[in-house]
């Protein structure tokens, strides 16, 4: 009987280390630890009501958002998995107001890990796909991290990825050499390579936006969406479909597989706080992944990966996905400025 040879995440990373010589061993180990933590989160998510982890925790995070029990548990899983391995100088999370330095009793490394432990957690109780998003940076101060150490533009990321906890659990990764997708084989507990070198089509007929906010949009976004909604009779001459899951990982994963544009723009409700999504652990890693897959990502006025962070929890407008559509929206913003 022949054995089916499959490429696991560990094998893939080791091969990348040998072939490209730009994947250091400690970065490889860090990615494997994050992936292992995502397996633990997936297990807890899948238990649902049986695991007594649904519902709110009776607390709020630094953004003033009500924390779900699984938000807190997922954050603890990632901290516990990564604090002792010697690969990190510090971590930062959506669920923590300030950064988490590696305790003095553990060895420290040269990387910084930033993550949203459970993106889309408002969907937990209704069994919609949710996920984990992460970004890896080098610590510019060696092994002594400060909050300033984290405030690097997205172009400085050395790795980024996300896990989706849905019908299958998948782990999507880039180290700056394309985008690959691994599916969790629950029988043996391994991440198995199932999609290589993912590419986002440059054109699309699908868009993702929360249309209930239409009355608050600025003119460039309103103009773009009005054109799409006009369909074949409008200026675009074709029909478009809207898809909105309200879970960034799920929406972006769909776009990564079949194209589309995802939009969470700034609007008139909070002119002093542009956008809702966080730059460091949502917009930057997703933009890195999307660009590596041939797509584009912008705030409307600037490439997201070029934005200089001013704080760990800074928010930005996010428009990403199929390149030609993203560039069209950016063009409308430029025209509105002139």
Swiss-Prot record:
Residue numbers binding substrate: 119-122, 210, 276
Reaction equation(s) it catalyzes: beta-D-fructose 1,6-bisphosphate + H2O = beta-D-fructose 6-phosphate + phosphate
GO molecular function, one term: magnesium ion binding
Cofactor binding mode and count: Binds 2 magnesium ions per subunit.
Binding residue positions for Mg(2+) 1: 94, 116, 118
Cofactor: Mg(2+)
Involved pathway(s): Carbohydrate biosynthesis; gluconeogenesis
GO aspect biological process, one term: fructose metabolic process
Subcellular location: Cytoplasm
Superkingdom of the source species: Bacteria
Keywords: Carbohydrate metabolism, Cytoplasm, Hydrolase, Magnesium, Metal-binding
Binding site for Mg(2+) 2: 116, 119, 282
EC class of the enzyme, as a word: hydrolase
GO terms under cellular component: cytosol
Entry's EC annotation: 3.1.3.11
HAMAP family hit by this protein: FBPase_class1
Family classification: Belongs to the FBPase class 1 family.
Oligomer and partners: Homotetramer.
Record's protein name: Fructose-1,6-bisphosphatase class 1
Organism of origin: Burkholderia mallei (strain ATCC 23344)
């Amino acid at each position: 009987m022949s054995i089916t040879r499959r490429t696991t995440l560990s094998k893939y990373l080791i091969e990348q280390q040998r072939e490209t010589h730009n994947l250091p061993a400690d970065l490889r180990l860090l990615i494997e630890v994050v992936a292992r933590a995502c397996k633990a989160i997936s297990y807890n998510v899948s238990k649902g009501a049986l695991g007594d982890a649904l519902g709110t925790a009776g607390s709020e995070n630094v953004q003033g958002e009500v924390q779900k029990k699984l938000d807190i548990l997922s954050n603890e899983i990632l901290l516990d998995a990564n604090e002792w391995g010697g690969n990190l100088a510090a971590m930062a999370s959506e669920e923590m107001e300030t950064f988490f330095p590696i305790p003095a009793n553990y060895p420290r490394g040269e990387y910084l890990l930033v993550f949203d432990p459970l993106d889309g957690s408002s969907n937990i109780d209704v069994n919609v796909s949710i996920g984990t998003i992460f970004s890896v940076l080098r610590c510019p101060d060696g092994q002594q991290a400060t909050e300033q150490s984290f405030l690097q533009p997205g172009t400085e990321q050395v790795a980024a990825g996300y896990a989706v906890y849905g019908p299958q659990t998948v782990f999507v990764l880039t180290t700056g050499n394309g985008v690959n997708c691994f599916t969790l084989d629950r029988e043996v507990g391994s991440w198995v390579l199932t999609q290589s070198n993912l590419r986002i089509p440059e054109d699309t007929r699908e868009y993702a936006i929360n249309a209930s906010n239409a009355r608050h949009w600025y003119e460039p976004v309103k103009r773009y969406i009005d054109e799409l909604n006009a369909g074949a009779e409008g200026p675009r001459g074709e029909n478009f479909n809207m898809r909105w899951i309200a879970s960034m990982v799920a929406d972006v994963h769909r776009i990564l597989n079949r194209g589309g544009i995802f939009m969470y723009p700034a609007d008139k409700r909070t002119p002093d706080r542009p956008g809702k999504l966080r730059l460091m652990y949502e917009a930057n890693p997703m933009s890195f992944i999307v660009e590596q897959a041939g797509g584009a990502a912008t705030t409307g006025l600037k490439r997201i990966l070029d934005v200089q962070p001013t704080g760990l929890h800074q928010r930005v407008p996010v428009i990403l996905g199929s390149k030609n559509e993203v560039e069209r929206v950016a063009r409308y913003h430029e025209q509105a400025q002139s």
